[in-house]
């Protein structure tokens, strides 16, 4: 591909973003996250990619939305890495699977099921989608320090949102329903759409990536008749992601 002054999709060049980047899916969430940075400013917006840059503890940091799913998320990571980013935290939403995962919880993923296809263009299916240990540790410590109810474990990643939520009407319903039962028996915490791709792409780029999510709903709790309310306030997950970045910055400085 022809070399461009700015990255083709995110419209950023070297110096526009920090080494540390938070990756929400929703462009509308970027400004909210940037408000927790110091000296934050708008950088660019193109397609699903909205970017702000600021500082934390004096270190340049950024937030870049990815849109929905692995394809657009992998593009964001590739292009951010091209201009100097190497540490990523996905902060997003998920739906609970295991019964003790409740609306409003924060889920930290230590691995992801590759029930999607972007990662298959980076690594064979036998290769696991595993979160970076340093980033995961920072997320867990941040959640505990902030007093958030937190779940740590494997998440399932898919390409089709309605394949999960309306599997019975799909021509491949037998596969979707059987695999969903397998995820339940394996005590998978939640379902979302980006982490499997991001973890594998990060490994291919020799970067660090972890994920934390706000639980919106748990359809298995609903089926079981357990109490829950839909929760769309992502503040807790955002706070955990930002606090984790601070801890990573401090740890990286101490290791120098």
Residues covered by each model-derived region:
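Metabolite-binding pocket within alpha/beta catalytic cores that recognizes anionic/polar moieties
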Residues: 1-138
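Glycine-rich beta-alpha junction loops
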Residues: 27, 95, 156-162, 197, ...
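Flexible, glycine/charged-enriched surface loops at secondary-structure junctions
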Residues: 40-45, 147-154, 250-256
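Short acidic/polar active-site loop segments enriched in Thr and Asp
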Residues: 86-87, 189, 208
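Active-site rim beta-loop-alpha module in soluble metabolic enzymes
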Residues: 130-187
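Generic non-transmembrane alpha-helical segments
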Residues: 138-146, 201, 240-251
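Zn-dependent metallopeptidase/amidohydrolase metal-coordination segment
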Residues: 196-230
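His/Asp/Glu-rich mid-to-C-terminal helical/loop segments that flank catalytic regions of hydrolases
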Residues: 219-256
């Amino acid at each position: 591909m022809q070399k461009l002054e700015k990255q083709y999709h995110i419209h950023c060049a070297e110096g526009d973003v920090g080494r540390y980047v938070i990756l929400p899916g929703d462009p509308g969430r970027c400004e909210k996250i940037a408000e927790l940075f110091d000296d934050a400013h708008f950088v660019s917006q193109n397609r699903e990619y909205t970017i702000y840059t600021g500082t934390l503890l004096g270190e340049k940091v950024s937030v870049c939305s990815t849109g929905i799913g692995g394809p657009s998320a992998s593009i964001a990571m590739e292009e951010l890495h091209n201009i100097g980013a190497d540490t990523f935290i996905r902060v997003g939403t998920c739906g609970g699977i295991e019964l003790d995962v409740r609306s409003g919880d924060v889920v930290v993923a230590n691995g992801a099921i590759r029930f999607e296809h972007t990662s298959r263009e980076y690594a064979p299916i036998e290769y696991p989608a595993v979160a970076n240990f340093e980033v995961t540790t920072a997320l867990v410590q941040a959640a505990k320090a902030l007093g958030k109810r937190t779940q740590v474990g494997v998440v399932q990643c898919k390409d089709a949102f309605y394949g999960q939520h309306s599997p019975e009407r799909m021509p491949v319903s037998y596969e979707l329903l059987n695999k969903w039962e397998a995820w339940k028996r394996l005590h998978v915490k939640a379902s979302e759409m980006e982490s499997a791709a991001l973890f594998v792409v990060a490994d291919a780029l020799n970067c660090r990536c972890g994920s934390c999510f706000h639980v919106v709903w748990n359809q298995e709790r609903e089926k079981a008749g357990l109490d829950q309310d839909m929760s769309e306030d992502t503040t807790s997950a955002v706070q955990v992601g930002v606090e984790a970045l601070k801890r990573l910055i401090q740890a990286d400085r101490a290791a120098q």
